[in-house]
Amino acid sequence: EEGVWLHGAVGWRMPLSGWRAAYVGDVLGWHDRARTHFDNYAASQVTEVPNTISHPAQDSALALARSAKIWGTPQYSNGYICRNPRRNNQMHHYDMNLCYIDELLWHFNWTGDLEYAHRMWPLLTLHLAWEKRNFDPDNDGLYDAYACIWASDALYYNSGAVTHSSAYNYRGNKLAALIAEKIGEDPTPYREEADKILKALNTRLWLPERGHWAEFQDFMGHRRLHEDAAVWTIYHALDSDVADPFQAYLATSYIDREIPHIPVVTSDDVL
């Protein structure tokens, strides 16, 4: 009755706009169901709440670890996509925008539906402006990550420069530029932002001596690089096309070489 994919099939059976579920419709050829999901959450994007409260706008009752749930803050303002379908007045603590938009862009890739891409263009541009406002306010081309991927309940980088969220935003801007060219919009700002992100990833977060990206760089203090990247850092970067072929080889070799491979043992293995 909701017309959207649930967050989980076994546990967490509730609607959520982003994370993984909405990729499945196009993979299975159910493009109509995918489009229904995207339409219902497009109706949940905030469009009439301008950003009137500046950074930082964190909740002091939660040790500043979450955004304050106040309309008009950078997070809860125009561009934000709310957690339930067809309801754009409900706050949630995740950044579900990032995966929802990535799923939508893959839908465009799968279907080649330029008419639909044209209709969703305002949603895409409002989202990209929202991401920039929230997660790259210093305009250095590298984005913070705030509860925005499947492993995200404990992933927040305190305004740091993060590989996986920067990679998502690279792909978002790169494809926005491509779509803009095809529908008669100006691709320049999106192409320039994608170029800036890729350059920053390669100059600040790529570790040539180790053959992979850093997890992130601290925003404060000594601005240290956190060099031991998680698996999600590698596959999100590759999926978002920020690597050249040799970088991709080196980064996947890092997983083979340095990430622990823990065997899964079942009763059949011990009998």
Provide a role label for each language-model segment.
Residues 1, 13-17, 52-54, 135-151, ...:
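Catalytic cores of carbohydrate-active enzymes
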Residues 8:
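Aromatic-residue-lined binding/catalytic grooves and analogous aromatic/hydrophobic interfacial grooves
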Residues 11-139, 162-170, 227:
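Aromatic-rich carbohydrate-recognition surfaces in CAZymes
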Residues 61-65, 147-148, 154-155:
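Short amphipathic alpha-helical patches
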Residues 126, 155-158:
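Extended hydrophobic secondary-structure segments
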